[in-house]
Amino acid sequence: MPASTARRLRVAVLADSDTRWKWGALTAARISSTEFTETTESTEKSDKTADSDIRLDGFLLRGRATPTVRQLKEIGVRADSLREVTAVEFLREMTKETYDVLVLALVGGGVQAMLHGLAHAWQGRPERPVVVTGYVGVVYEKLADGLLLRHGADLVLANSRQDAERFRAVYEGVGADASSVTEVALPFLGGAPYEKKDPYTVVFAAQPSVPETRKDRSYLLDRLVRHARRHPEREVLLKLRSKPGEHTTHIEELPYQKLAQRHDLPANLRLVYGNMGEVLDRTDLLVTVSSTAALESLHRRIPTVVLTDLGVREALGNHHFVGSGCLASWDQLDAGHEPTPDAEWVARQGVAAGSTPSGEGSYATAFGEARERVAELLTTGELPPLKPYYTPVTAPGYLPGVLARHHLAPDGSPLPGAPVADKAPGPVRQIVRRAARGAYRHGVQRVAPVIRRMGEL
Protein backbone atom coordinates (compact mmCIF):
# COMPACT_ATOMS: atom_id res chain seq x y z
CA MET A 1 0.00 0.00 0.00
CA PRO A 2 1.33 3.45 -0.80
CA ALA A 3 1.94 5.46 2.33
CA SER A 4 2.83 9.09 2.89
CA THR A 5 6.28 9.94 4.15
CA ALA A 6 6.66 13.47 5.40
CA ARG A 7 9.83 15.45 4.77
CA ARG A 8 11.03 19.02 5.01
CA LEU A 9 10.56 21.14 1.93
CA ARG A 10 13.78 22.35 0.35
CA VAL A 11 13.41 26.01 -0.58
CA ALA A 12 15.86 28.35 -2.29
CA VAL A 13 15.58 32.14 -2.30
CA LEU A 14 17.56 34.38 -4.66
CA ALA A 15 17.54 38.05 -3.61
CA ASP A 16 19.35 41.18 -4.78
CA SER A 17 18.88 43.53 -1.80
CA ASP A 18 18.16 43.57 1.92
CA THR A 19 14.42 44.20 1.60
CA ARG A 20 14.00 41.60 -1.12
CA TRP A 21 15.84 39.03 0.97
CA LYS A 22 13.47 39.76 3.83
CA TRP A 23 10.44 39.48 1.52
CA GLY A 24 11.72 36.34 -0.19
CA ALA A 25 12.66 34.44 2.94
CA LEU A 26 9.45 35.30 4.79
CA THR A 27 7.36 34.54 1.70
CA ALA A 28 9.04 31.15 1.41
CA ALA A 29 7.99 30.34 4.96
CA ARG A 30 4.44 31.61 4.43
CA ILE A 31 3.68 29.72 1.22
CA SER A 32 5.42 26.45 2.06
CA SER A 33 3.14 23.93 3.73
CA THR A 34 4.06 22.98 7.27
CA GLU A 35 3.69 19.42 6.11
CA PHE A 36 4.54 18.04 2.69
CA THR A 37 3.94 14.39 1.89
CA GLU A 38 5.32 12.26 -0.88
CA THR A 39 4.04 8.82 -1.79
CA THR A 40 6.31 5.83 -1.19
CA GLU A 41 5.78 2.10 -1.33
CA SER A 42 5.47 0.84 2.23
CA THR A 43 3.39 -1.59 4.19
CA GLU A 44 3.64 0.53 7.34
CA LYS A 45 1.70 3.62 8.24
CA SER A 46 3.40 6.45 9.99
CA ASP A 47 1.64 8.90 12.27
CA LYS A 48 4.62 11.23 12.33
CA THR A 49 4.22 14.70 10.86
CA ALA A 50 6.87 16.66 9.09
CA ASP A 51 9.02 19.23 10.85
CA SER A 52 7.19 22.55 10.62
CA ASP A 53 10.41 24.22 9.45
CA ILE A 54 11.67 24.29 5.90
CA ARG A 55 15.19 23.83 4.64
CA LEU A 56 15.99 27.36 3.45
CA ASP A 57 19.04 28.10 1.31
CA GLY A 58 19.62 31.78 0.60
CA PHE A 59 21.50 33.19 -2.38
CA LEU A 60 22.40 36.89 -2.59
CA LEU A 61 22.87 38.11 -6.15
CA ARG A 62 26.12 40.02 -6.38
CA GLY A 63 25.55 43.67 -7.28
CA ARG A 64 25.38 47.25 -6.05
CA ALA A 65 22.70 46.49 -3.43
CA THR A 66 24.04 43.24 -2.00
CA PRO A 67 23.20 43.56 1.71
CA THR A 68 25.90 44.04 4.32
CA VAL A 69 26.32 41.86 7.39
CA ARG A 70 24.72 44.59 9.51
CA GLN A 71 21.68 44.78 7.24
CA LEU A 72 21.24 41.01 7.32
CA LYS A 73 21.42 40.98 11.12
CA GLU A 74 18.87 43.79 11.31
CA ILE A 75 16.43 41.83 9.14
CA GLY A 76 16.75 38.90 11.51
CA VAL A 77 15.68 36.19 9.04
CA ARG A 78 17.74 33.04 9.45
CA ALA A 79 18.62 30.62 6.67
CA ASP A 80 20.22 27.19 6.79
CA SER A 81 22.80 28.53 4.34
CA LEU A 82 23.43 31.95 2.84
CA ARG A 83 26.00 32.97 0.26
CA GLU A 84 26.72 35.51 -2.44
CA VAL A 85 26.59 34.39 -6.08
CA THR A 86 26.71 35.69 -9.63
CA ALA A 87 23.76 35.01 -11.92
CA VAL A 88 25.64 32.34 -13.84
CA GLU A 89 26.90 30.72 -10.64
CA PHE A 90 23.35 30.55 -9.31
CA LEU A 91 22.07 28.95 -12.52
CA ARG A 92 24.82 26.37 -12.32
CA GLU A 93 23.87 25.65 -8.69
CA MET A 94 20.25 25.09 -9.73
CA THR A 95 21.38 22.27 -12.04
CA LYS A 96 23.29 20.58 -9.21
CA GLU A 97 20.84 20.86 -6.32
CA THR A 98 17.23 19.70 -6.11
CA TYR A 99 14.71 22.09 -4.58
CA ASP A 100 10.96 21.95 -4.11
CA VAL A 101 10.37 25.71 -4.26
CA LEU A 102 12.43 28.57 -5.67
CA VAL A 103 11.56 32.17 -4.77
CA LEU A 104 12.97 34.86 -7.07
CA ALA A 105 13.09 38.02 -4.94
CA LEU A 106 14.59 40.30 -7.56
CA VAL A 107 13.94 43.42 -9.58
CA GLY A 108 11.86 42.69 -12.70
CA GLY A 109 14.80 42.43 -15.10
CA GLY A 110 16.54 40.02 -12.76
CA VAL A 111 13.46 37.81 -12.57
CA GLN A 112 13.16 37.72 -16.36
CA ALA A 113 16.84 36.85 -16.77
CA MET A 114 16.60 34.03 -14.24
CA LEU A 115 13.43 32.63 -15.84
CA HIS A 116 15.18 32.37 -19.21
CA GLY A 117 18.40 31.14 -17.63
CA LEU A 118 16.56 28.47 -15.64
CA ALA A 119 14.51 27.41 -18.67
CA HIS A 120 17.78 26.81 -20.52
CA ALA A 121 19.49 25.14 -17.55
CA TRP A 122 16.57 22.77 -16.93
CA GLN A 123 16.14 21.61 -20.53
CA GLY A 124 15.46 17.89 -20.58
CA ARG A 125 15.19 17.72 -16.81
CA PRO A 126 12.21 15.62 -15.67
CA GLU A 127 11.58 17.62 -12.49
CA ARG A 128 12.07 21.21 -11.40
CA PRO A 129 11.07 23.42 -8.44
CA VAL A 130 7.90 25.47 -8.24
CA VAL A 131 9.08 28.98 -9.19
CA VAL A 132 7.57 31.91 -7.29
CA THR A 133 8.06 35.66 -7.59
CA GLY A 134 6.29 38.90 -6.68
CA TYR A 135 6.78 42.38 -5.26
CA VAL A 136 8.32 43.63 -2.02
CA GLY A 137 5.68 46.28 -1.37
CA VAL A 138 3.38 48.83 -2.94
CA VAL A 139 3.28 48.65 -6.75
CA TYR A 140 2.84 52.25 -7.80
CA GLU A 141 4.93 52.58 -10.97
CA LYS A 142 5.93 50.62 -14.08
CA LEU A 143 3.04 48.21 -13.57
CA ALA A 144 2.99 46.66 -17.05
CA ASP A 145 6.78 46.62 -17.41
CA GLY A 146 7.42 44.98 -14.05
CA LEU A 147 4.61 42.46 -14.42
CA LEU A 148 5.60 41.27 -17.89
CA LEU A 149 9.20 40.87 -16.71
CA ARG A 150 7.87 38.56 -13.98
CA HIS A 151 5.62 36.53 -16.28
CA GLY A 152 6.66 32.91 -16.65
CA ALA A 153 6.90 32.00 -12.97
CA ASP A 154 4.46 29.39 -11.67
CA LEU A 155 3.17 31.86 -9.09
CA VAL A 156 3.24 35.65 -9.39
CA LEU A 157 2.19 36.86 -5.95
CA ALA A 158 -0.04 39.90 -5.53
CA ASN A 159 0.06 41.53 -2.10
CA SER A 160 -3.63 42.48 -2.07
CA ARG A 161 -6.96 41.88 -3.75
CA GLN A 162 -6.52 45.18 -5.58
CA ASP A 163 -3.12 44.16 -6.95
CA ALA A 164 -4.40 40.73 -8.00
CA GLU A 165 -7.13 42.36 -10.08
CA ARG A 166 -4.66 44.76 -11.70
CA PHE A 167 -2.12 42.02 -12.41
CA ARG A 168 -4.66 39.78 -14.13
CA ALA A 169 -5.92 42.69 -16.22
CA VAL A 170 -2.40 43.39 -17.52
CA TYR A 171 -1.67 39.76 -18.40
CA GLU A 172 -5.03 39.19 -20.03
CA GLY A 173 -4.70 42.49 -21.88
CA VAL A 174 -1.59 41.33 -23.73
CA GLY A 175 -2.89 37.81 -24.27
CA ALA A 176 -0.65 36.21 -21.64
CA ASP A 177 -1.68 33.44 -19.26
CA ALA A 178 -2.89 35.06 -16.02
CA SER A 179 -3.38 31.86 -14.02
CA SER A 180 -0.10 32.41 -12.17
CA VAL A 181 -1.43 35.50 -10.34
CA THR A 182 -2.09 34.52 -6.74
CA GLU A 183 -3.43 36.81 -4.04
CA VAL A 184 -1.49 36.87 -0.77
CA ALA A 185 -0.40 39.69 1.55
CA LEU A 186 2.88 41.23 2.58
CA PRO A 187 4.71 38.48 4.49
CA PHE A 188 6.19 40.75 7.15
CA LEU A 189 2.97 42.13 8.62
CA GLY A 190 2.37 41.34 12.26
CA GLY A 191 3.20 42.59 15.71
CA ALA A 192 1.11 43.56 18.70
CA PRO A 193 -2.01 45.71 18.18
CA TYR A 194 -1.53 49.39 18.92
CA GLU A 195 -1.70 50.72 22.46
CA LYS A 196 -1.00 54.33 23.40
CA LYS A 197 2.50 55.01 24.68
CA ASP A 198 4.04 57.52 27.05
CA PRO A 199 5.70 59.59 25.81
CA TYR A 200 3.71 59.97 22.60
CA THR A 201 6.07 58.94 19.80
CA VAL A 202 5.99 60.18 16.21
CA VAL A 203 8.02 58.19 13.66
CA PHE A 204 8.87 59.49 10.19
CA ALA A 205 9.67 56.52 7.93
CA ALA A 206 12.24 57.81 5.46
CA GLN A 207 12.65 56.40 1.96
CA PRO A 208 15.92 56.19 -0.01
CA SER A 209 14.60 57.73 -3.24
CA VAL A 210 11.23 59.34 -2.40
CA PRO A 211 11.27 62.26 -2.67
CA GLU A 212 14.31 62.52 -4.87
CA THR A 213 15.48 66.15 -4.86
CA ARG A 214 17.54 67.91 -2.22
CA LYS A 215 14.88 70.63 -1.98
CA ASP A 216 12.07 68.19 -1.19
CA ARG A 217 14.09 66.05 1.21
CA SER A 218 15.32 69.15 3.03
CA TYR A 219 11.74 70.39 3.28
CA LEU A 220 10.56 67.16 4.92
CA LEU A 221 13.44 67.22 7.39
CA ASP A 222 12.73 70.88 8.20
CA ARG A 223 9.08 70.08 8.91
CA LEU A 224 10.05 67.14 11.12
CA VAL A 225 12.37 69.41 13.11
CA ARG A 226 9.63 72.05 13.41
CA HIS A 227 7.14 69.42 14.60
CA ALA A 228 9.56 68.26 17.29
CA ARG A 229 10.07 71.83 18.50
CA ARG A 230 6.35 72.55 18.43
CA HIS A 231 5.65 69.43 20.52
CA PRO A 232 8.51 69.09 23.05
CA GLU A 233 6.39 66.60 25.02
CA ARG A 234 6.58 64.16 22.10
CA GLU A 235 9.42 61.87 21.14
CA VAL A 236 10.13 62.27 17.41
CA LEU A 237 12.12 59.61 15.53
CA LEU A 238 13.56 59.75 12.03
CA LYS A 239 13.63 56.08 11.00
CA LEU A 240 16.41 55.56 8.46
CA ARG A 241 16.66 52.66 6.02
CA SER A 242 20.43 52.36 5.87
CA LYS A 243 23.66 53.72 7.24
CA PRO A 244 26.01 55.82 5.09
CA GLY A 245 27.74 53.64 2.51
CA GLU A 246 25.02 50.99 2.50
CA HIS A 247 22.49 50.51 -0.27
CA THR A 248 18.96 49.17 -0.22
CA THR A 249 16.48 48.25 -2.94
CA HIS A 250 16.52 51.89 -4.11
CA ILE A 251 19.57 54.12 -4.51
CA GLU A 252 19.82 56.90 -1.92
CA GLU A 253 21.70 59.87 -3.33
CA LEU A 254 20.87 62.28 -0.50
CA PRO A 255 20.90 60.50 2.87
CA TYR A 256 18.96 62.26 5.62
CA GLN A 257 21.96 61.74 7.91
CA LYS A 258 23.92 64.12 5.70
CA LEU A 259 21.12 66.69 5.55
CA ALA A 260 20.64 66.51 9.32
CA GLN A 261 24.24 67.59 9.91
CA ARG A 262 23.21 71.11 8.93
CA HIS A 263 20.53 71.27 11.63
CA ASP A 264 20.66 71.92 15.34
CA LEU A 265 18.32 69.06 16.19
CA PRO A 266 16.04 69.45 19.23
CA ALA A 267 16.61 67.08 22.13
CA ASN A 268 13.40 65.15 21.46
CA LEU A 269 14.35 64.32 17.83
CA ARG A 270 16.59 61.34 17.17
CA LEU A 271 17.80 59.43 14.12
CA VAL A 272 17.23 55.68 14.53
CA TYR A 273 17.97 52.48 12.65
CA GLY A 274 16.80 48.96 13.31
CA ASN A 275 14.00 46.59 12.46
CA MET A 276 10.82 48.45 11.48
CA GLY A 277 8.66 46.08 13.52
CA GLU A 278 10.59 46.94 16.67
CA VAL A 279 10.30 50.66 15.95
CA LEU A 280 6.54 50.29 15.44
CA ASP A 281 6.30 48.68 18.89
CA ARG A 282 6.81 52.16 20.35
CA THR A 283 5.04 54.24 17.69
CA ASP A 284 1.91 56.35 18.27
CA LEU A 285 1.90 58.06 14.88
CA LEU A 286 3.62 56.81 11.72
CA VAL A 287 4.34 59.46 9.08
CA THR A 288 5.70 58.78 5.60
CA VAL A 289 5.48 59.81 1.96
CA SER A 290 4.68 56.37 0.58
CA SER A 291 6.74 53.77 2.44
CA THR A 292 5.47 50.21 2.78
CA ALA A 293 5.88 50.88 6.51
CA ALA A 294 2.48 52.59 6.25
CA LEU A 295 0.86 49.22 5.53
CA GLU A 296 2.73 47.61 8.42
CA SER A 297 1.50 50.41 10.67
CA LEU A 298 -2.10 50.18 9.44
CA HIS A 299 -2.07 46.43 10.01
CA ARG A 300 -1.35 47.08 13.68
CA ARG A 301 -3.95 49.89 13.76
CA ILE A 302 -1.35 52.53 14.54
CA PRO A 303 -2.47 56.03 13.46
CA THR A 304 -0.84 56.50 10.07
CA VAL A 305 -0.29 59.56 7.88
CA VAL A 306 0.69 59.66 4.21
CA LEU A 307 1.96 63.17 3.53
CA THR A 308 0.40 65.47 0.94
CA ASP A 309 2.85 68.36 1.40
CA LEU A 310 4.62 67.65 -1.90
CA GLY A 311 1.39 66.83 -3.70
CA VAL A 312 -0.37 63.54 -4.36
CA ARG A 313 1.61 62.30 -7.35
CA GLU A 314 2.52 59.08 -9.11
CA ALA A 315 6.20 60.02 -8.87
CA LEU A 316 5.92 60.01 -5.08
CA GLY A 317 3.84 56.84 -4.84
CA ASN A 318 1.39 58.41 -2.41
CA HIS A 319 -1.35 58.27 -5.05
CA HIS A 320 -1.63 54.61 -4.05
CA PHE A 321 -3.19 55.77 -0.77
CA VAL A 322 -6.03 57.75 -2.35
CA GLY A 323 -9.19 56.61 -0.57
CA SER A 324 -7.27 55.34 2.46
CA GLY A 325 -8.30 58.19 4.74
CA CYS A 326 -4.62 58.60 5.70
CA LEU A 327 -3.67 61.58 3.53
CA ALA A 328 -2.70 64.68 5.53
CA SER A 329 -0.11 67.46 5.71
CA TRP A 330 2.44 68.53 8.30
CA ASP A 331 0.30 71.58 9.09
CA GLN A 332 -2.56 69.26 10.05
CA LEU A 333 -0.24 67.07 12.13
CA ASP A 334 1.20 70.10 13.91
CA ALA A 335 -2.37 70.98 14.88
CA GLY A 336 -2.90 67.54 16.44
CA HIS A 337 -4.75 65.76 13.60
CA GLU A 338 -4.88 61.94 13.65
CA PRO A 339 -6.51 60.39 10.57
CA THR A 340 -8.96 57.49 10.65
CA PRO A 341 -8.29 54.88 7.94
CA ASP A 342 -11.07 53.74 5.63
CA ALA A 343 -11.92 50.15 6.62
CA GLU A 344 -12.88 49.03 3.12
CA TRP A 345 -9.71 50.44 1.56
CA VAL A 346 -7.58 48.80 4.23
CA ALA A 347 -9.28 45.44 3.67
CA ARG A 348 -8.53 45.62 -0.07
CA GLN A 349 -4.86 46.05 0.77
CA GLY A 350 -4.76 42.78 2.72
CA VAL A 351 -3.97 44.45 6.05
CA ALA A 352 -5.76 44.94 9.37
CA ALA A 353 -6.88 41.33 9.71
CA GLY A 354 -10.49 40.91 10.69
CA SER A 355 -11.20 44.62 10.48
CA THR A 356 -14.35 44.25 8.39
CA PRO A 357 -17.66 42.55 9.26
CA SER A 358 -17.28 40.21 6.29
CA GLY A 359 -13.88 39.07 7.50
CA GLU A 360 -12.19 40.23 4.29
CA GLY A 361 -8.58 41.13 4.77
CA SER A 362 -7.99 38.30 7.26
CA TYR A 363 -4.23 37.94 7.49
CA ALA A 364 -4.45 34.46 9.00
CA THR A 365 -5.82 33.06 5.74
CA ALA A 366 -4.04 35.39 3.31
CA PHE A 367 -1.51 32.77 2.20
CA GLY A 368 -3.90 29.82 2.03
CA GLU A 369 -4.42 29.93 -1.74
CA ALA A 370 -0.68 30.17 -2.40
CA ARG A 371 0.07 27.24 -0.09
CA GLU A 372 -2.59 25.15 -1.81
CA ARG A 373 -1.23 25.98 -5.26
CA VAL A 374 2.34 25.15 -4.26
CA ALA A 375 1.24 21.85 -2.71
CA GLU A 376 -0.80 21.00 -5.80
CA LEU A 377 2.10 21.71 -8.15
CA LEU A 378 4.46 19.66 -6.00
CA THR A 379 2.19 16.63 -6.23
CA THR A 380 1.67 16.83 -10.01
CA GLY A 381 5.11 15.40 -10.68
CA GLU A 382 6.72 16.78 -13.83
CA LEU A 383 6.09 20.50 -14.31
CA PRO A 384 6.01 22.07 -17.78
CA PRO A 385 8.98 24.16 -18.97
CA LEU A 386 9.06 27.80 -17.92
CA LYS A 387 7.50 29.97 -20.64
CA PRO A 388 7.86 33.74 -20.08
CA TYR A 389 5.78 36.14 -22.16
CA TYR A 390 8.92 37.85 -23.44
CA THR A 391 10.81 35.77 -26.01
CA PRO A 392 13.18 36.59 -28.90
CA VAL A 393 10.02 36.58 -31.03
CA THR A 394 7.72 38.77 -28.89
CA ALA A 395 10.39 41.25 -27.74
CA PRO A 396 13.44 40.96 -30.04
CA GLY A 397 14.52 44.55 -29.38
CA TYR A 398 14.11 44.41 -25.60
CA LEU A 399 14.77 40.94 -24.21
CA PRO A 400 18.41 40.52 -25.37
CA GLY A 401 19.42 43.65 -23.46
CA VAL A 402 17.63 42.50 -20.29
CA LEU A 403 19.41 39.14 -20.42
CA ALA A 404 22.80 40.60 -21.37
CA ARG A 405 22.85 42.66 -18.18
CA HIS A 406 23.04 39.35 -16.37
CA HIS A 407 25.55 37.89 -18.85
CA LEU A 408 23.03 35.66 -20.59
CA ALA A 409 22.46 35.13 -24.30
CA PRO A 410 18.97 35.48 -25.87
CA ASP A 411 18.42 31.74 -25.43
CA GLY A 412 19.24 31.93 -21.70
CA SER A 413 22.68 30.36 -21.96
CA PRO A 414 25.69 32.05 -20.30
CA LEU A 415 27.60 34.46 -22.52
CA PRO A 416 31.30 33.76 -23.10
CA GLY A 417 33.35 35.26 -20.30
CA ALA A 418 30.40 35.54 -17.92
CA PRO A 419 31.61 36.07 -14.32
CA VAL A 420 31.35 32.95 -12.23
CA ALA A 421 32.99 31.92 -8.97
CA ASP A 422 33.79 28.28 -8.33
CA LYS A 423 35.22 28.86 -4.88
CA ALA A 424 34.89 31.33 -2.06
CA PRO A 425 36.75 34.58 -2.82
CA GLY A 426 40.03 35.09 -1.02
CA PRO A 427 40.72 37.97 1.38
CA VAL A 428 42.24 40.17 -1.34
CA ARG A 429 39.28 39.71 -3.69
CA GLN A 430 36.86 40.42 -0.85
CA ILE A 431 38.69 43.68 -0.10
CA VAL A 432 38.64 44.66 -3.79
CA ARG A 433 34.90 43.95 -4.01
CA ARG A 434 34.14 46.00 -0.91
CA ALA A 435 36.27 48.84 -2.26
CA ALA A 436 34.48 48.72 -5.62
CA ARG A 437 31.08 48.82 -3.95
CA GLY A 438 32.22 51.66 -1.72
CA ALA A 439 33.42 53.61 -4.75
CA TYR A 440 30.08 53.07 -6.48
CA ARG A 441 28.11 54.20 -3.45
CA HIS A 442 30.40 57.22 -3.03
CA GLY A 443 29.72 58.13 -6.65
CA VAL A 444 25.97 57.82 -6.15
CA GLN A 445 25.79 59.74 -2.89
CA ARG A 446 28.52 62.35 -3.38
CA VAL A 447 29.65 62.82 -6.99
CA ALA A 448 26.31 62.41 -8.81
CA PRO A 449 24.48 65.13 -6.80
CA VAL A 450 27.36 67.56 -7.43
CA ILE A 451 27.29 66.88 -11.17
CA ARG A 452 23.52 67.30 -11.20
CA ARG A 453 23.75 70.65 -9.41
CA MET A 454 26.44 71.83 -11.85
CA GLY A 455 24.15 70.92 -14.73
CA GLU A 456 21.42 73.10 -13.24
CA LEU A 457 23.64 76.22 -13.17
Residue ranges and their predicted role:
Residues 2-11, 53, 194-202, 457:
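A short, charged/proline- and glycine-enriched loop
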Residues 9-34, 47-48, 52-57, 61-177:
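Active-site and donor-binding regions of nucleotide-sugar-utilizing enzymes
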Residues 23, 189-256:
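Conserved catalytic-core segment of nucleotide-activated headgroup transferases in glycan assembly
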Residues 84-87, 270-278:
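Conserved active-site histidine-acidic residue motif and adjacent donor-binding/catalytic loop
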Residues 152-217:
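A nucleotide-sugar donor-handling region in carbohydrate enzymes
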Residues 252-274:
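Nucleotide-activated donor-binding/catalytic signature segment of Leloir-type glycosyltransferases, i.e.
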Residues 273-316:
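A donor-sugar binding/catalytic signature common to diverse glycosyltransferases
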Residues 334-457:
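C-terminal amphipathic helix plus adjacent low-complexity
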